[in-house]
Amino acid sequence: RICKTEEFAKKLDEFVDHIARDRLDGADFMVQDVVGVRVVIPNQSKHGRTLNFHQGIWFGHGPGMFSIWSPITEAYDSNTMQILPWQASRDITQNTYNEQWDYQKIQQECLKHSIPCNASPGQSWLFQQGHLHGNINNDTDITRWSFDTRVLVKGGNYGRRRPGGYFRLFGEYRQPLS
């Protein structure tokens, strides 16, 4: 796995430091050990591949984490990730719990408030785990490639994603087994 090499980890640390350090007020943080690569093909809903709106907390990511989402190709219109403003995310989340909304209802409400994360290669979005985000059907003829990773602020709630397993210390790299 390329993510497990020291060379890749150093490049990832440089990238994360550049994107996140100032925005996290200089706080120390850990870095997700393995990044995710996302591929959004044209008309992906036809193939059952649309990523429903969700928040990281629903998948075990604690509120002490931040996601960094970065397109590798142009990301715009319907081929990009969609995100909801913070207050809309909080309101919909509260209603989801209070009224026991199903995924269909969550999707309908999120569509009313979502905005496209238009970005070019070299640009990134940094957001909290409580932000609702997801995809809509890619109606463009362009496949969007992106990657995402997460940082855990020192002392932050990590949910089910444990330091030392899901995260590694910034600037520390695994040594290959001999």
Predicted regions and their residues:
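Catalytic core of non-heme Fe(II) oxygenases with the double-stranded beta-helix
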Residues: 47-119
